[in-house]
Amino acid sequence: MKRFVLPILITLFIISASAVFTLNFRPLYYHDISSLNIEETSGYSENVIRENYDALIDYNSVFHRGSLDLSLPMSREGRIHFQDVKRIFDVLQILCVLSLIGSLILGIRAWKQGYRGFLKSAAVLSVFLPVIAGILIAFNWGNAFILFHELMFSNDYWLFDERTDPVINILPDEFFLHCALLIILLILAASLIMGLIYLRQKKRRSGGPQLTF
């Protein structure tokens, strides 16, 4: 049972770190402003779009205290939804730090004891989420997007009305698709790296040909 704890911690770290990185990777959204023609579809200037997007990202930081201040109008339901989103991201950021600490403590101990199997287990375990998510996205991104919101939120406040919450016009579904794809790629990359490290260590211990990077 103890040998499952470390791979689970590593997997939790990889998933949460990938999500936190994507949340804070603002260049992705800045690129989408032009590639998705958000200025034209929303009717707002790039400065206004960036200002409100940056306010959302700053608000979702675990260190942020206070209310969300947008230059765009916002309904009561919209504000509640963003509060719900912040709680989720706060949990993710805390989970990221705690799982990293746990992974380092147990990982260093396992490494010193000569145990490398946790790398293989974590590599395999961390693949499941992106595979499932990838299948859902490939099958129907719209339904996957709706399913995610229905699972994560206990209300329907995420169904914005652009007349009362025009911020939805600067957050197209395609942007969230790009975020999902980036998270999947990061998780798969981490899984691949762990798998390669495991194979290299296995070859080294068996005296076989060395894997080089």
Residue ranges and their predicted role:
Residues F139-E162:
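Juxtamembrane non-transmembrane "cap" segments at the membrane-aqueous interface
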Residues M1-Y29:
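Hydrophobic secretory-pathway targeting helix
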Residues F4, L100-F145, I193-F213:
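Juxtamembrane interface at the cytosolic side of transmembrane helices
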Residues L23-T41, H149:
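Alpha-helical transmembrane signal-anchor/signal-peptide segments
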Residues S34-N47, G66-R76, K120-F139:
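Hydrophobic alpha-helical transmembrane segments
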Residues S42-S61:
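Short extracytoplasmic
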Residues N60-L98, D173-I183:
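Individual transmembrane alpha-helix segments
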Residues L159-R205:
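Terminal transmembrane helical module of multi-pass membrane proteins
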